[in-house]
């Protein structure tokens, strides 16, 4: 299977992506992360109104292979949570960059160390 990394997103070496639109960021996990996790069976996400701090844990993704903590790449306030992925975690694998997003955040602290799609592809493909 060919993994895709949309050019309009920014990536982190921890395999999250973010879509910045003004001062709002949509966070999710990359196709590479989905591929490594396997079948996702449970997702725990913060509540709307929760504050995120860079580097702090904000949720968990559980698969048949592993339980992985999610760490905030930025600071801000959660303004939306994707209830669809909580109810149906497999939605993350079906469409990680679309309907499989995790949270939307009103950004107060921008992340550092963001990678372009090309740089992220090179990282995960070992080039």
Swiss-Prot record:
Binds 1 lipoyl cofactor covalently. Its cofactor is (R)-lipoate. The modification N6-lipoyllysine is found at residue 65. CDD domains: GCS_H. InterPro entries: 2-oxoA_DH_lipoyl-BS (IPR003016), Biotin_lipoyl (IPR000089), GCV_H (IPR002930), GCV_H/Fam206 (IPR033753), GCV_H_sub (IPR017453), Single_hybrid_motif (IPR011053). SUPFAM superfamilies: Single hybrid motif. One of its GO terms (cellular component) is cytosol. Residues 24-106 form the Lipoyl-binding domain. Keywords: Lipoyl. PROSITE patterns: BIOTINYL_LIPOYL (PS50968), LIPOYL (PS00189). GO terms for biological process: glycine decarboxylation via glycine cleavage system. The glycine cleavage system catalyzes the degradation of glycine. The H protein shuttles the methylamine group of glycine from the P protein to the T protein. The glycine cleavage system is composed of four proteins: P, T, L and H. PANTHER family: GLYCINE CLEAVAGE SYSTEM H PROTEIN, GLYCINE CLEAVAGE SYSTEM H PROTEIN-RELATED. NCBIfam families: gcvH, PRK01202.1. Belongs to the GcvH family. This is Glycine cleavage system H protein. The lineage of its organism: Bacteria, Bacillati, Cyanobacteriota, Cyanophyceae, Acaryochloridales.
């Amino acid at each position: 299977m060919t993994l895709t990394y949309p050019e309009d997103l920014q990536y982190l070496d921890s395999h999250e992506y973010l879509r910045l639109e003004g001062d709002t960021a949509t966070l999710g996990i990359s196709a590479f992360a989905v591929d490594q996790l396997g079948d996702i069976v449970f997702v725990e996400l913060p509540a709307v109104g929760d504050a995120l701090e860079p580097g702090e844990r904000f949720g968990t993704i559980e698969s048949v292979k592993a339980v992985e903590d999610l760490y905030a790449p930025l600071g801000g306030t959660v303004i939306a949570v994707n209830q669809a992925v909580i109810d149906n975690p497999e939605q993350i694998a079906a469409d990680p960059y679309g309907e499989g997003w995790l949270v939307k955040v009103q950004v107060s602290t921008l992340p550092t160390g963001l990678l372009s799609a090309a740089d992220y592809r090179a990282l995960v493909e070992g080039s």
